UniProtKB/Swiss-Prot annotation:
Originating gene: PYR4
Catalytic reaction list: orotidine 5'-phosphate + H(+) = UMP + CO2
Protein name listed in UniProt: Orotidine 5'-phosphate decarboxylase
Amino acids binding substrate: 38, 60-62, 91-100, 213, 232
InterPro entries referenced in this protein's UniProt entry, alphabetically: Aldolase_TIM (IPR013785), OMPdecase (IPR014732), OMPdecase_AS (IPR018089), OMPdeCOase_dom (IPR001754), RibuloseP-bd_barrel (IPR011060)
Length: 265
């Protein structure tokens, strides 16, 4: 199964351009760490991105919470992405009809498609949401993740919702290259959906607001995900930013090497 192959091998075989770029980057930098930087000022976002950039494969943003957002922020972030070699994932969680999301993705003040390599969407509105986003994203070489499972307590993203989301992805593999999920989604030998898993923590199990945390090993080795998404465990400790980023990068990479050893004997 592709889930258990080296990232470099998967990159060579992958049909999706965005997935290839991500897998190649992960192998090149030896990191499967994505950091969710949910801060509300331009200064904080740039400062954190610069500090953790060397250790991540993906910087995950909620760009609409930045109170002093401007075009210069995007330009500075793009320069940091070149400097440190990482991709952007704007965690927009689109959830409207195709015609609406098309404009939300391309236009408005954020112009997400112009700078973010990866974005994501709920499948509640049906397949039209994928078609609308693809109209904008495909010509730019962007990639889409579907929200198949969430890490919050009581989430409704389970059962038939998850199953139907996977079927939608299979029908749109030119643009959809993976999922936000808690477990691997590949069921067939020729499938290679990349799974990015939020809710990863080494020190705590929850936050009192419904978030449930798992360790990098649980996520990568036991559940078969590919990228760990860490938020407050890194940016929540400003005096230990680099130390924590290095710690999670190492834990994630060690888990990946363990998975390779287990399945490629």
């Amino acid at each position: 199964m592709n889930t258990y192959k080296p990232y470099s091998e998967r990159a060579k075989q992958h049909s999706n351009a965005c997935a290839r770029s991500l897998l190649e980057l992960m192998e090149r930098k030896q990191t499967n760490l994505s950091v969710a930087v949910d801060v509300t000022t331009k200064k904080e976002l740039i400062s954190i991105a610069d500090a953790i950039g060397p250790y991540i494969c993906v910087l995950k943003t909620h760009i609409d919470i930045v109170e002093d957002f401007d075009a210069d922020l995007i330009q500075q972030l793009q320069e940091l992405a070149k400097k440190h070699d990482f991709l952007f994932f704007e965690d927009r969680k689109f959830a409207d009809i195709g015609n609406t999301v098309k404009h939300q993705y391309a236009n408005g003040i954020y112009k997400i498609a112009s700078w973010s390599h990866i974005t994501n969407a709920h499948t509640v509105p049906g397949e039209g949401i994928i078609k609308g986003l693809a109209e904008v994203g495909l010509p730019l070489g962007r990639g889409l993740l579907l929200l198949a499972e969430m890490s919050s307590k009581g989430a409704l993203t389970k059962g038939s919702y998850t199953t139907d989301s996977v079927e939608m992805a299979r029908r749109n593999k030119d643009f959809v290259f993976g999922f936000i999920a808690q477990n691997k989604m590949n069921q067939y030998d020729d499938e290679d959906f990349i799974v990015m898993s939020p809710g990863v923590g080494l020190d705590v199990k929850g936050d009192g607001l419904g978030q449930q945390y798992r360790t990098p090993r649980e996520v990568i080795v036991e559940s078969g995900a590919d990228v760990i998404i860490v938020g407050r465990g890194i940016y929540g400790q400003p005096d230990k930013l680099v130390e924590q980023a290095q710690r999670y990068r190492q834990a994630g990479w060690d888990a990946y090497l363990e998975r390779l050893a287990l399945h490629n004997k």
